[in-house]
Amino acid sequence: MEKKWIAILGSPRRGKNTEGLMDYYIKELEKRGRKVDKVILSEIEQNSCNGCEYCIRNNTCHHKDEISSIIDKIKDVEGIILGSPSYNYNVTSYMKIFLDRLFSLFDFGNGSWSSQLDSKGIKSIVIGVCAGPDSLSMGFTIEAMKRVMMDHGVEILIEESYFGTKRNPVDRNEEIRSEIMRKFDEVFLS
């Protein structure tokens, strides 16, 4: 059976730091025999959650857009890559819409909740990128993506925080590829 991953890019800026870093991770996954589909959130039809709670009653979102089909695909993947630059200390609005829509994967009943992704063994790589010099500049970007993944029972394999893109853009950083390869070796060989 083919091992599939899905990469969700929250940056509207094509070919820049977040996508460059994500592409390095995609190449490493492909080297290890994984098929990776990349979704550019800024280029697809998406509707934001309006809090109607249709999903609580029906186990699916009432919106029928490209986000809905991506959510259906997520149920059958080995792993998910989430990548977003930090916009005002948080994920982009594109990523926020996507994360909010994942709420439709929760099952509510008997006074508790669980995720349709629980016990599927799905893994994730979470990537945050910012121009600022340190983790304070990143704000909640990584945490926002991690929390949603963890609530769905998705294991975080790698958490990548990349700072200082103004002085050290991804495409000029010679060391980042070898660092990513090292992280993959630690995770995939252990």
Question: Which residues fall in each region the model found?
Answer:
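Short beta-strands and strand-loop turn motifs
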Residues: I8, V126-V129, E160
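Short, glycine-/small-residue-rich phosphate/pyrophosphate-handling segment
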Residues: N110-E155
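N-terminal beta1-alpha1-beta2 submodule of the flavodoxin-like/Rossmannoid cofactor-binding fold
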Residues: M1-S84, N88-D107, L157-I158, R167-S190
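Active-site rim beta-loop-alpha module in soluble metabolic enzymes
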Residues: G164
